[in-house]
Each structure stands twice: as structure tokens, then as C-alpha cells.
Amino acid sequence: GITLKKVSKFANSHYLALDILIAANTKPGIAKVKVGNETIDFPLQKRRVGNGSQFANGATSSDLIYLIMPDRFSNGDPSNDRIAGMRDQTLNRDTVFNRHGGDLKGIQNHLDYLYDLGVTAIWLNPVIINDMPERTEHGYAFTDHYKIDPRIGGEKAYKELIDAAH
């Protein structure tokens, strides 16, 4: 069976970590996990045999990995360009030192373009919150490791991009 060893809660209530122990003889199927008033179906897959190097493909020379700085790629949702309460309110496409307004929706809107280029994987600059007074366009001034920056769309847009890309 399955044994719950530890529950870890985070500042962002959208996340919860469960440390579980799955016995070697546990069969594949659906485990019901109760979280508060909600029950979540957790799929238990058939265990793979051997070490990871026997079945992990990773990136190969046949892959085309495309690095995207979301702020610079495409502005798919102008409503998130400036977020009240955030310190960096700059928005000026005429200088490299300010935010340009690109976001996750802009990337999602151009998945066909990336596909047509032959892209097999998208590598994003950091997308977590960068609430610093300036130079936050690159994503490396993160101030919260558990929240997606709302100026590029937040958690909802991040999930939508991932779902659309797969």
C-alpha cells in the first residue's frame, strides 16, 4: 500500500507536498488522496525496471530547444503589463532596460510558429515573481519561489501554456 509520511505546506496555498512511501508490491491504479474537503485521483503507474539511464531519453542532437525570455517574446495579454502593488511599473519597448510586456499568453499564441520552426522543447527564462524596483524583465531577480509572476500571466497562464504545448 501507500503510507503518508509527511505533509508540507507552503506560503502559496496552491501547493502542498506529500512525502509518501509506496510499497514495492503496490499494484498500478488510482489512489484516492483526500486534501481538505477535496479528493484527488493520484495515478500509480507501473514501476519501471532498472536505473533511470536505461529509459530516460533526455535531449538529443535531434531536438531543437528554443530559449524564450517571456517579457521579450510576445504580448498576448496587455491587461497584465502593469500589476498594482508591484515595484517595477516600467513598460517601454524603446529601451532594453525596461519591461516590454511579453507574457505566457503571447508564447501560447505563437506555438504554431515554434512548431513550424521545428522546436521540440521550450526553455523559459525564470517565470517566478520578480518584485524588485527595476530590471525585472529577465526573470532572475526572483522574490518568491512559489508564485508565477502575474505580469506574465500568473499560475493560470502558466498551466494553460503547458497544457497547450503538450
Region spans (language model):
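Immunoglobulin-like IPT/TIG beta-sandwich domains and homologous Ig-like subdomains
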Residues: 1-37
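N-terminal structural segment of carbohydrate-active enzymes
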Residues: 36, 40-166
